[in-house]
Amino acid sequence: MSELGAKYQQLQNELEEFIVARQKLETQLQENKIVNEEFDQLEEDTPVYKLTGNVLLPVEQSEARTNVDKRLEFIETEITRCEKNIRDKQEELEKMRSELIKLNNTAASTGPGR
């Protein structure tokens, strides 16, 4: 029973890690959407710079837009994957919770004095 409890705790920790990862991805998604909105407000000839280390380097606006679009696509794919992991872990936890309840009920009905 304690082994099952430890496994259940481990699954809860894994689920929590997936949820935190999902939240980080959501933050990144929102940040990149804001950058995309900023690009929409720029004139075509407005210079765009990329921070590399401590240096701002000029980049083509089209290249910067493409990079942000690719990043958005990647983040959305990661969010989908992360959400699937969360669902799978929740299902696993629910099955284990049912097992623990059954074991608890069995132990209670066959416990001392019965």
Swiss-Prot record:
GO BP annotation list: chaperone-mediated protein complex assembly; positive regulation of transcription elongation by RNA polymerase II; protein folding; tubulin complex assembly
Annotated Gene3D superfamilies: 1.10.287.370
Keywords, ordered alphabetically: Acetylation, Chaperone, Nucleus
Subcellular location: Nucleus
One of the Pfam families matching this protein, by short name: Prefoldin_2
PTM-bearing positions, type N-acetylserine: 2
Gene Ontology CC: one annotated term: nucleus
CDD domains from the UniProt entry: Prefoldin_6
PANTHER family recorded: PREFOLDIN SUBUNIT 6
UniProt similarity note: Belongs to the prefoldin subunit beta family.
Function statement: Binds specifically to cytosolic chaperonin (c-CPN) and transfers target proteins to it. Binds to nascent polypeptide chain and promotes folding in an environment in which there are many competing pathways for nonnative proteins.
Misc remark: Present with 784 molecules/cell in log phase SD medium.
Protein name according to UniProt: Prefoldin subunit 6
Gene name in the database record: YKE2
